């Protein structure tokens, strides 16, 4: 009896040891998981990363609550918010809340704060790293000039995100470096004045326009950012900046940072 007990105990110890020893495989990162280091070691992956930013300009959420798609695209959010049409989502639709005055600081489907800043971070990281991607000799011939264009396309996309923030919120934090996600205090950035945001957007678009072609010649580049797109967005940004909403609007005279910085210009320019 004692002998059988010892044999069972020994077998259990062996089994436990084999199970614990086999857990090492869990420490290996799955090959299909893409990391930032992998992306910026391969020009093809880096180009795909840029493509994903083009995709992210549109907030691909539920169509009934997607602000950019409904505000600027083929769907008309304002049509459903008025009496022109009825949202098929019924009483749960954001447009219904809009009609009834139900939008609050806690529920605002038109707000893109997190989405925009996520893309700002992604574009900034791309701008900082794309020129460091190693290229083979054959890739140098293909991508030598394109890398500079990739960088400026990302610069445009970042400027567009700030334009979108400007037209929604006016003065916003201007973040031009990739923040450390572990540094909570460093993430607490105050808002910058409207004029500073406008100047930044225009400066970024000028730089991008100086590198990108006037237009793209072949259909494979259809939809890519061009010099014309940069100048068009700059013109629209300046139009917003010159509007009574932002230019000398005294309704915003008390909108200041804690240090007293005036966030909206109070004199008409």
Residue ranges and their predicted role:
Residues 1-31:
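Bacterial Sec-dependent N-terminal signal peptides
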Residues 23-76, 256:
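Membrane-proximal, proline-rich intrinsically disordered regions
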Residues 31, 65-69, 171-175, 247-250:
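Outer-membrane beta-barrel and related beta-rich outer-membrane complex signature
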Residues 42, 47-63, 87-169, 185-199, ...:
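Conserved, well-structured interaction surfaces
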Residues 166-167, 173, 216, 240-249:
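Short coil/turn linking the two alpha-helices of tandem helical-hairpin repeats
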Residues 223-233:
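Amphipathic alpha-helical protein-interaction segments enriched in hydrophobic
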Residues 249-268:
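A solvent-exposed, charged loop/short amphipathic helix patch at secondary-structure junctions
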């Amino acid at each position: 009896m004692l002998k059988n007990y010892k044999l069972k105990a020994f077998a259990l110890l062996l089994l436990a040891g084999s199970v614990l020893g086999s857990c090492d495989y869990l420490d290996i990162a799955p090959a299909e998981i893409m990391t930032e280091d992998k992306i910026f070691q391969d020009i093809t992956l880096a180009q795909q990363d840029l493509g994903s930013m083009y995709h992210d300009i549109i907030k691909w959420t539920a169509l009934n609550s997607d602000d950019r798609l409904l505000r600027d695209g083929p769907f008309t959010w304002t049509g459903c918010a008025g009496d022109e049409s009825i949202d098929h989502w019924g009483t749960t639709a954001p447009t219904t809340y809009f009609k009834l005055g139900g939008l609050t600081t806690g529920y605002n489907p038109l707000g893109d704060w997190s989405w925009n800043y996520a893309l700002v971070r992604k574009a900034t990281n791309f701008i900082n790293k794309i020129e460091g991607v190693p290229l083979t000799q054959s890739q140098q011939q293909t991508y030598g000039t394109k890398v500079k264009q990739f960088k400026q396309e990302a610069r445009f996309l970042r400027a567009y995100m700030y334009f979108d923030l400007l037209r929604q919120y006016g003065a916003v934090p201007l973040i031009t470096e990739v923040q450390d996600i572990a540094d909570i205090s460093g993430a607490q950035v105050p808002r910058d004045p409207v004029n500073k945001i406008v100047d930044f957007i225009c400066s970024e678009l000028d730089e991008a326009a100086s590198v990108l072609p006037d237009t793209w010649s072949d259909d494979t580049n259809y939809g890519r950012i061009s010099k014309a797109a940069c100048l068009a967005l700059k013109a629209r940004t300046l139009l917003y900046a010159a509007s009574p909403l932002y230019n000398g609007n005294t309704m915003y005279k008390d909108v200041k940072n804690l240090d007293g910085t005036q966030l909206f210009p109070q004199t008409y320019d």
